Amino acid sequence: MNKHLKHLCVVSVISVAAIISPKVFSQVSASIACPDYKRGPTNIPGQKVGKKVGKALEAYTNDLIDEALNILYDIDTSNTFDRAFTDRFIGNLLATQNGKARKSIEYLQKAVAPNKLNDSEQVGTIKLIADLSLQEEQYDSALKYYKQWLEVTCKEDFDVYFRMANAYYQTQKYAEIIAPINKAIALAKKPNKTAYALKMTSYYSRKMYKETIQVQEETVRIFPDDKGQWTQLGFFYMLVEDHKKALSTFEMAYMQGYLSKPAEIKALSQLYSMNNIPVKAAKILEKYLKSGLVKTDERMLTSVASSYQQAKEFKEAADFYGQSAKLSSDPDLYKKQGMVYYALEKYSSAIVALQKALDGGSDKKGPIHLAMMQANFDNGDFKSAYKHVKEAKKDKSTARNARSWEPYIKEKAKNRGIKL
């Protein structure tokens, strides 16, 4: 059982001894703060019940809880206060035992039902029922008794409002979370991270992303040293496609050393790319592929290659397309490598890579033959260029372009005395 609740129950049991002393009843209870509150009459158990309660208390103080309970179970009284007092004592004792919380709640509910307990005991028991109900996942009951406690005491209590918000969360009544969690946040002696998380979850679960982000922004301001808050805010910005704010947030987190997960590094790289900074997208991902934080696979290598290509860093792009192609069964990666080599005017390397794409079974044969024609032509190999232009003519997607190249190749070859 929850240690805090168990402590409360023990305190409540010990208070039974004090309640029997008439001196206690001269004290004004501070349990109720309502402006028009007038303390009710003070009651003490009748002599017969009081004796048995005393014996039960003695057994309890000697750690004989079962014996104490048997004494209390044996009490038979028609007096409403004595019955409520006894049921409260039984409920408190049961609450200290593992697995007896639900039975405890039943006795405590019977104790408060007639509203005959002394004021402080009445409100304390109402609160205990609520806490035990929350522990036992009886959320509707917990909410009922927390609300009753607030109504009876006129008090503002962080724990009560926080637990009410939690009960609403557990029952997926997300809209209901806001009122109590706002009060809990206002009452907290110091900022409570979980309270802000509950508030954020309320909005997020209802797809109210603007409000979700506002709460998360506030959370980052209050807990700037919590790295998880930064990345969560960044991901929320990505969710609403505010890529500039997302990048700014992830960059600040990165500079503070807060990015430690592969998904976070990948997100930063992706955001650089989305914000048209492909060279940074490539370099950050390359760095953490080398460190081992991000697993090296075809997808990551291709991402680095693509970013370098966008940045017109063709040498690096060709290298990473080649690495990716070796890990993959995708021949089109060799095609991409070949096109990058062509941009670098490395025609021989382009031809080798493009041939690997063909040998690997690429279904883009027409475009590959056309690219190989161009690479061979620029490399001065008109015979090979002519061979590939004829192959390119067989593909509908490249036939027209190939036909326009064919006479040009023939003319160049003729001018140089080369027979095709």
Label the predicted regions.
Residues 2-126, 134-140, 144, 170, ...:
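N-terminal leader/linker segments that initiate helical-solenoid repeat arrays
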Residues 298-312, 318-363:
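Alpha-helical adaptor scaffolds
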Residues 44-53, 81-87, 118-127, 153-162, ...:
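Generic helix N-cap/helix-start motif at coil->alpha-helix transitions
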Residues 37-44, 73-81, 112-118, 147-155, ...:
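Solenoid-like repeat scaffolds
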Residues 59, 94, 133, 168, ...:
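Residue at a conserved register position within TPR or TPR-like alpha-solenoid repeats
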Residues 65, 100-101, 139, 174, ...:
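TPR-repeat structural position
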Residues 62, 97-98, 136, 171, ...:
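Structural motif corresponding to the intra-repeat A-B loop/turn of tetratricopeptide repeats
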